[in-house]
Amino acid sequence: MGYETKSTLDTERSTAPGTGTTTKSCSMTQVVLRFVLFAATLTSIVVMVTSKQTKNIFLPGTPIRIPAAEFTNSPALIYFVVALSVACFYSIVSTFVTVSAFKKHSCSAVLLLNLAIMDAVMVGIVASATGAGGGVAYLGLKGNKEVRWGKICHIYDKFCRHVGGAIAVSLFASVVLLLLSIISVLSLYKKIR
């Protein structure tokens, strides 16, 4: 009987919220994922901002310069850059907050709740920006016959590759944010349990 009580107490101590290796590994996982989020959002922003391409059409006589393709031509792509900039800034702030809490070996329930809420908000923002950018990219690639919007990717190939790459990295950032959101909620659950 005495042996069972000791065993139960040891088990409760090792699984108590805020103790043990689970919380440490969870915090370290959050730090790593937040750094990966920073790298992904920054990469996506840089690729999108550097996507400008200018083309000249050569007809007999004189070359004609057609308008440059750049992200500022589309409100959806501007939203994409702004949303990812917000997520990039959030990743910097949340990484510092998480590292600070990790160094103190104490992560309050209020901090975990704030991280869980903000991670969920950022998932929505980045996912919506990825969808908006993806819609514009699809129109550029395939066009829309019903409203007579032509394809542009056969003309602006470099621009379309940049936009596609930025959207792919942004989709990866959305998955990282989703994982962070799940980890934040699980950490909060373990803390208040």
From Swiss-Prot:
UniProt-annotated stretches for the region Disordered: 1-24
Keyword terms of this UniProt record: Cell membrane, Membrane, Transmembrane, Transmembrane helix
Keyword Transmembrane annotated: yes
InterPro entries according to UniProt: CASP/CASPL (IPR006459), CASP_dom (IPR006702), CASPL (IPR044173)
Residue intervals passing through the bilayer: 31-51, 77-97, 109-129, 163-183
Biased composition regions of type Polar residues, renumbered to the chain: 14-24
GO CC terms in record: endosome; Golgi apparatus; plasma membrane; trans-Golgi network
Chief location category: membrane
Membrane topology value: Multi-pass membrane protein
Localization, UniProt: Cell membrane
Extracellular compartment residues: 52-76, 130-162
Cytoplasmic side: 1-30, 98-108, 184-193
Superkingdom per UniProt: Eukaryota
Similarity field: Belongs to the Casparian strip membrane proteins (CASP) family.
Quaternary structure (record): Homodimer and heterodimers.
NCBIfam families, per database record: A_tha_TIGR01569
Protein name in the entry: CASP-like protein 1D1
The organism of origin for this protein: Arabidopsis thaliana (Mouse-ear cress)
Phylogenetic placement of the source organism: Eukaryota, Viridiplantae, Streptophyta, Embryophyta, Tracheophyta
